[in-house]
């Protein structure tokens, strides 16, 4: 097409544009536009000349060649992501800006809008508002009559706070501040305001610090939040998926042709980055109504609102964190040599166990006797199962046991101790995984002994953790007699194995509901 064979020449381009569009032409005629395109192509390959038609300068000796449309080395023009309605009907090359340059020269700037595309088959179930084009940096939403009003906005900062998100007319507006409320924020809150930091937040994308605010917002520090905007934090209108500023990523940089794919990819990255935080259960606690009732004089700030003063007491806390400074959740388990300290670190605030794995290398001094474990397993199988099942188990064990024997044949005592330390160190990491996993899980050695178990497995089977790990005697393996398995027990052999009573269908449903409630707690 001729639109693709245009040459980036400012003189020829201006002449072609003036010849292409006239002021008196109002109808969009496809045939007429094709004639104009042919005339434009002829004019671009025509050499420069004076008024008499004589060639002048370097163009007299060399003429511009006409490029072959199939030539891969021909200069190409950057295509727009979506043409406007006028350029789409005329089959002309459009631009990303709105209004485009062709509509501006024709006087159709007010009517310049994106053309309608045919939906793909996989997008038939997508809503129409999710298929809007990605708004580029050159997108101009305001028409010419509103530009004069925006120029006078810096003198009155409060009048420019109505609609903060620059979205098309179809999207809802997001009023975040009351138009008639102004005030000067005290210095302590300016320095410790969490949703004014440089870190992106999925809940407060439009808050800025004093240094990086627009020109129309320099006079406003923290106005009182209106009731409508306060309800938007907990309502569904604020979390509009068509609003790109909600997720704090650049949709233009993702190079997607519509919001449907860009938002999905951006939200996946948003979740992967860990910036998605748990919203507060009570929206009124996250954003109090009496923000504007702060002390703006020489009196100390937050005299009448102690809970609000505690919100911004820590810079490291996430947005809308309302816990007091000493209300960190304690660690679930602390196995460090030194006792629990009075000041908890960031890891304890997140509920992670503050253990020291170096204790493994100090406590493990003997290798684990897998030979004794295999003999105990064989004796238990012969006593518990029938001869046919025992033979099948023995064949299965015989296929894997020679591999372990050949691996440990050349190892000395230090190697076996090192192997046990590696096992305990790996088990140290597995226990953290099992603590955060809701699936009933247990870790066994290759000889069958249980090395670790999580809480969900004990709830499922009815066995306590001490019995499963062999710390307390039972009637299965650790009977309380002398041996390696009962070395850590109390020595009493009167403990009985717990028996699960048979239950009917109603009791099973009740038990499943109770176990689900326990897991949720």
Swiss-Prot record:
Region (Disordered): 1-75, 273-308, 322-358, 478-501
Acidic residues bias spans: 1-12
Bias-annotated ranges (Low complexity): 297-308, 337-351, 480-494
GO CC terms of this entry: nucleus
Location(s), subcellular: Nucleus
Keyword presence, Nucleus: yes
UniProt entry keywords in alphabetical sequence: Activator, DNA-binding, Gluconeogenesis, Metal-binding, Nucleus, Transcription, Transcription regulation, Zinc
InterPro entries on file: ERT1_acuK_gluconeogen_tf, PAS_13, Zn2-C6_fun-type_DNA-bd_sf, Zn2Cys6_DnaBD
Composition bias, Polar residues: 275-287
SMART domains, per the entry: GAL4 (SM00066)
PANTHER family to which the protein is assigned, alphabetical: TRANSCRIPTION ACTIVATOR OF GLUCONEOGENESIS ERT1, ZN(II)2CYS6 TRANSCRIPTION FACTOR (EUROFUNG)-RELATED
Name listed for the protein in its UniProt record: Transcription activator of gluconeogenesis SS1G_02293
Species the sequence originates in: Sclerotinia sclerotiorum (strain ATCC 18683 / 1980 / Ss-1) (White mold)
Species lineage: Eukaryota, Fungi, Dikarya, Ascomycota, Pezizomycotina
């Amino acid at each position: 097409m001729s639109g693709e064979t245009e040459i980036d020449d400012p003189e020829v381009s201006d002449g072609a544009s003036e010849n292409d569009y006239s002021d008196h032409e109002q109808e969009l005629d496809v045939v007429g536009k094709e004639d104009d395109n042919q005339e434009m192509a002829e004019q671009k390959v025509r050499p420069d000349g004076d008024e008499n038609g004589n060639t002048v300068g370097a163009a007299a000796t060399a003429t511009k060649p006409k490029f072959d449309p199939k030539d891969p080395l021909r200069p190409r023009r950057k295509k727009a992501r979506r043409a406007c309605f006028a350029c789409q009907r005329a089959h002309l090359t459009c631009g990303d800006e709105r209004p485009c340059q062709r509509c501006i020269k024709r006087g159709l700037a007010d009517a310049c809008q994106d053309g309608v595309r045919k939906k793909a088959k996989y997008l038939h179930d997508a809503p129409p508002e999710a298929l809007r084009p990605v708004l580029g940096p050159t997108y101009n939403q305001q028409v010419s009559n509103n530009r004069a009003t925006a120029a006078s906005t810096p003198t009155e900062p409060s009048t420019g706070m109505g609609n903060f998100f620059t979205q098309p007319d179809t999207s809802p507006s997001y009023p975040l501040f009351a138009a008639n409320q102004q005030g000067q924020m005290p210095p302590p809150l300016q320095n410790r305001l969490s949703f004014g930091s440089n870190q992106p937040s999925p809940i407060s994308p439009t808050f800025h610090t004093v240094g990086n605010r627009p020109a129309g917002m320099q006079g406003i520090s923290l106005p009182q939040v209106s009731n409508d905007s306060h309800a938007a934090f907990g309502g569904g209108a604020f979390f509009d998926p068509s609003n790109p500023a909600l997720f704090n990523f650049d949709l233009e940089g993702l190079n997607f042709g519509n919001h449907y794919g860009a938002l999905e990819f951006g939200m996946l990255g948003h979740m992967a980055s860990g910036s998605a935080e748990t919203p507060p259960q009570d929206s009124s606690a996250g954003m109090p109504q009496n923000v504007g009732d702060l002390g703006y004089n020489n009196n100390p700030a937050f005299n009448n609102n102690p809970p609000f003063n505690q919100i911004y007491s820590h810079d490291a806390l996430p947005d809308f964190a309302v816990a007091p400074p000493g209300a960190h959740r304690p660690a679930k388990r602390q196995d460090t040599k030194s006792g629990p300290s009075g000041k908890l670190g960031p890891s304890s605030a997140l509920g992670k166990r503050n253990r020291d794995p170096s204790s493994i290398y100090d406590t493990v001094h003997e290798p684990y006797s897998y030979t004794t474990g295999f003999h105990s397993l064989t004796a238990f199988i012969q006593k518990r199962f029938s001869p046919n099942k025992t033979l099948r188990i023995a064949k299965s064990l015989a296929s894997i046991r020679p591999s372990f024997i050949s691996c440990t044949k050349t190892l000395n005592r230090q190697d076996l101790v090192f192997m046990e330390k590696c096992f305990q160190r790996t088990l140290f990491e597995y226990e953290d995984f099992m603590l955060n996993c809701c699936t009933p899980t247990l870790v066994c050695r290759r000889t069958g002994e249980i090395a670790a178990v999580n809480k969900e497995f004990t709830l499922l089977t009815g066995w306590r953790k001490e019995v499963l790990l062999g710390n307390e005697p039972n009637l299965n393996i650790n009977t309380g007699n002398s041996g390696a398995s009962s070395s850590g027990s109390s020595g009493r052999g009167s403990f009985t194995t717990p028996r699960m009573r048979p239950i009917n269908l109603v009791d099973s449903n009740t038990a499943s509901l109770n176990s689900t409630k326990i897991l949720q707690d």
